């Protein structure tokens, strides 16, 4: 199970990075929009942190997506 969780974290982080770049946002801008720390955004994008449902909602909202849409982009 830990390997699967790590894979999901990486997939989600890559999706967040892809969406951020598609929206032409810096990590700092995304952190501001999602009301999260810059460090936390970096850790998510590197696949080092599992996000909570609240964080998922905040990130999706910053991209003007639903949480389900953001998860779908991560192929989760």
Question: Which role fits each region the language model picked out?
Answer:
Residues 35-50:
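Recognition helix of helix-turn-helix/homeodomain-like DNA-binding domains
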Residues 48-58:
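Short, basic-rich loop-to-helix N-cap that marks the start of a DNA-contacting helix
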Residues 56-60, 70-71:
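Hydrophobic micro-packing sites on short alpha-helices
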Residues 14-33, 58, 63:
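Short basic helix-loop element that most often maps to the first helix and adjoining turn
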Residues 28, 39, 68:
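Key DNA-contact positions within bacterial/archaeal DNA-binding proteins
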Residues 1-11:
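A detector for short, charged/polar N-terminal pre-domain segments
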Residues 64-76:
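Short C-terminal boundary/hinge segments that cap the last helix of small helical domains
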